């Protein structure tokens, strides 16, 4: 039954369980801390590469040309927007883990993001990432490294 629940429903079950059994709150906090204090560099790199290469061309087409309320939007600008949107969840996760003091996980996350960007440094023609420009992965990596420095995340 639990396996068929959505993530939101699982969260509701956890909230109800902790409310009903406050003694489980300590264990739930311990498990949450353990989860947030670790990050797999390889998994993060895979997720970043998949997120960037998985942006559909239809999304680019929907944002280029004449756009109501914006005027004409060039394909490079639209591609950049889409690429930035794809990388934003990883940047947000980095900020969250740094704010929580999970420095090892934050460091691993930075390395994973940069590794994922390195993997897609030569995107295939016709991909949204290619439309964004050949320097896009390196510019995004620089942005992540700047964010890490601003957050005080040390990279080994």
Indicate residue ranges for each PLM-predicted region.
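Amphipathic alpha-helical packing elements
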Residues: 1-24
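Eukaryote-biased, non-catalytic alpha-solenoid scaffold regions
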Residues: 22-156
């Amino acid at each position: 039954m639990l396996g068929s629940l959505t993530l939101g429903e699982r969260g509701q079950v956890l909230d109800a369980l902790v409310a009903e059994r406050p003694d489980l709150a300590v264990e739930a906090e311990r498990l949450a801390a353990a989860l947030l204090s670790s990050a797999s560099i390889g998994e993060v790199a895979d997720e970043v590469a998949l997120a960037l290469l998985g942006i559909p061309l239809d999304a680019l087409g929907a944002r280029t040309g004449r756009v109501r309320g914006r005027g004409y939007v060039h394909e490079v600008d639209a591609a950049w927007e889409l690429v930035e949107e794809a990388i934003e969840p990883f940047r947000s996760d980095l900020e969250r883990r740094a704010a929580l003091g999970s420095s090892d996980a934050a460091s691993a996350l930075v390395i994973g993001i940069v590794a994922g960007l390195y993997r897609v440094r030569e995107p295939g023609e016709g991909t949204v990432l290619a439309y964004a420009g050949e320097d896009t992965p390196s510019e995004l990596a620089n942005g992540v490294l700047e964010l890490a420095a601003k957050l005080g995340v040390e990279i080994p």
